[in-house]
C-alpha cells in the first residue's frame, strides 16, 4: 500500500471542514477556536466534551438551536402575518432530524411547532409540550403535526385525541382510517 494520493484526486487537506470564521453558516453560532487552536462549542472545549463522552459523540448546541428556532418562528409569523393578506405562518422543527424531549422543549419554548412522522415522535413531542404548556397540553396538540407514509389507525387516533394541529393524510385509505378513528 502507498500513502500517495492518486493522480487527479484532490489532496486530503481539501476535505477538511472549513474554520468557523470562514463558514459560520456551517457551525453553531458559539463555535470558535481558542488561541492555541482548540475548537470550542457552546462554551466547552472539544477536549472537555471528549473527556466526558468518548468519541464518537453528538454535540448539540442549545443556544444555537434556540436562536435558530426563534429566528424561524419570528420570520414565519412576520412574513405571513394576516394583516399582510396572508393566512398566517408557522415554523415546524422536523422531529426526524433529531428528537429528544429536551430538544422538543427547546424548540417549543422558542415558538416553533414540531413535525412528527411516527407515534414515537408524537409521544416525545406531546411529553415535551406538557412540560412547556402544562397539564392542558395533554389534550391540546395544536402546535404539533403528524405526517408520514403508512400511518396506522392507532397513530391517527392518538393525533386526533390530542388535537394535533396539522394531520397530513397521504391517501384515501388514511382518510378512511381517520374517519374510523373518531
Residue ranges and their predicted role:
Residues 1-182:
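A charged N-terminal "starter" segment
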